Amino acid sequence: SFTPEEICTLTMEFYRRNYIEGLFLSSGILHSPNETMEQICKALRDLRIIHRFNGYIHCKAIPGADPALIEMAGWYADRMSINLELPTEEGLKRLAPNKTRKTILTPMRQIQNGMAESREYLGMKGGNYGAYHFTQERKQKRLAMRGAKDAFGTHAISRGVTSASGAHTVSRGVKGVPGTNADTGGYKISHSGSGDSVITGTDLMRQGKASSGLQLWNSCDTKRGFVPAGQSTQMIIGASGETDYEIMAVSEALYRRFDLKRVFYSAFINVNKDSTLPALDSQPPLRREHRLYQADFLLRYYGFEANELLSPSRPNFNTYLDPKCDWALGHLELFPVEIESADYDTLLRVPGIGVKSARRILAARRSTKLTFQDLKKLGVVLKRAVYFITCSGRMMYPTKLEEDYIVRNLTDPKDRIRFGSDGMSYRQMTLFDDGMFPNGVRQEEKLII
């Protein structure tokens, strides 16, 4: 491993040559958590104070280290993270017996409380909250204006969100969501089908008890806020038999209870072929990892909840369709959506419409009526959206609002979609198509070159 001096030298040499813009600093445990964290803090302090390094620093906190060392690192780093590793306690005991939920969640809670105290002291209104906080805040304001139902009328207000002061307000539990109890209104630990305990709700709060506050305000020779870029965590996917539903429920609880900026997902790869580690029957679950990232964005930016995307009866994502399309196909009664009148949150739930394109639609339709060509220019992915929207009461072309029909078109390997009742269709020509048309191109088929 590198010494603190070597880390400083390498970082500054790369930084001066404009090879890097920041540093990601992590370490395995050497001798003890405290000794390792001391070395990390020394490297961070030397970079900031001695070398005047002003670049971005993401630092890994070592579970089990002294709270004072965790706080010291937070004053010098932009972002900190503590890996949750696995969503179930049993999986953690089996694959990482040297770690416990308490040693992981306690420093996570300490960092959260320190961030809230720093925000309040510095008067940061927006602060370093994650996207999930602002999405839920917007959602609560909208629901308060409209009543108890959401934009689609699918479920009532039932979740607590983080307030501007950093305090949490919790309402009733939601029926069908792991870790909640609709009768008592309290969050509790849930159990997977295999008997594993899933970390959610009150269990997270109980394991991560609040610290007594920041103690090193004037001791670190820095005017930076405490962890100004927020904190994140990571989970390993496919190592302990957890379902996507369990993983997303844990991620949602972490966003809500610990103000995380991001939850990262890493497909399990058995590198050293250790017999104590699970053996993979196939390739690493990279597509599953991709679907989890897509669903994570739906939680943070689009206002979805874990129990909307998955359920105990359908615990895993569709590998052929992205989670948003899969959700829309299960709720065809809510479509098509009229582009000219739909509000922002309704537009966000349409496949093919993202955050930027939804905002552009709202801005553009104030001055003109939108056509499908306009939507394409605004960034809407018509390949997916065309089945779920209308412009001025008309669809782009006559199509069936049927699940099987839409799935066939969305999963066609050649992406052939008919764009008119005259039979005209489009597809991308490849470099190897020269000899594929001995009789020439058919009149009803147009190739895009």
What do the PLM-derived regions correspond to, one by one?
Residues 364-365:
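Residue-level signature of tetratricopeptide-repeat
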Residues 347-351:
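Short amphipathic alpha-helical boundary/capping segments
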Residues 1-233, 237-241, 254, 272, ...:
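Conserved Radical SAM active-site core
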Residues 93-94, 99, 103-112, 238-323:
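A structural motif corresponding to the C-terminal lobe/cap of the Radical SAM core domain
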Residues 151, 155-158, 164, 194, ...:
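HhH-family (HhH-GPD) DNA N-glycosylase catalytic core used in base-excision repair
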Residues 316-346, 372-449:
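C-terminal extensions
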